[in-house]
Amino acid sequence: MPSMADMPLSYFLFDSMTRLLSPYQFNPFDINPLRDVMAESIDFDELRECDCIKLFISATHVHSGKVRVFHTQEIDLDVVMASACLPFLYKAVTIEGEDYWDGGYLGNPALFPLFYETDTRDLMIVHINPMERDETPKTAHEIMNRINEISFNSSLLKELRAIAFVKKLVEYDMLKDEHKQDFMDILVHSVRSDDIMTKLSVASKFKSDWDFLTDMRDKGRATMKSWLDQNFDALGEHDTVDLHGEFLNSTTKIFENHRGDHTHKAS
């Protein structure tokens, strides 16, 4: 687990400030350098006309506490900024008269559009937060760091549990004939690099120096290449991650008990 010595003094000062003041107080003009970078880098008019891929971006509706998923034709600069709006750093982003925060609170990422609105069987998840850590955090900042990771992973785990449930319904042929065409056995793939990510603290998310960013890019590409070398042939054929073994535990037991009951009755 990253130590306090790995965190720059500027992070501690900024963290302390955000606990005392809101962005409406310390950043009244809502200055966000990322907004300028996105505006200069992405042609949103061209993006909205794209019909070769489906892009889904989620944001949290502040008033209702519900997730809103924006589709390709709806995406503009405000949508992108809303999806990354951490409320202790930036003012809520207003879209069509409604305020939004970071989508990660309810979907990190939101998976359901990928199997409700696409025909592909393969679902690939690229993790940017470590799922597990070997040590129990002891310092205040280590504890907050781990809480941050668990909070943002919780929505993903809930969706993975739902996917695992449907996969078991299909596997054990528990769907009525009239509903079988409405569900398919999603093939789940998980790209993780916990050995790299566990060395980084929440403070690393505030680092913007070029060397750090390019280093993370290179490590990400190396991780993806390694995954493809090992698993490319599995795409479209079978899962490459054990949902129950890596993320869940109770769902399998429920279905195994169900199968045992049926076996007992049949005998």
Regions found by a protein language model. Give the residues of each.
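Patatin-like phospholipase
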Residues: 1-267
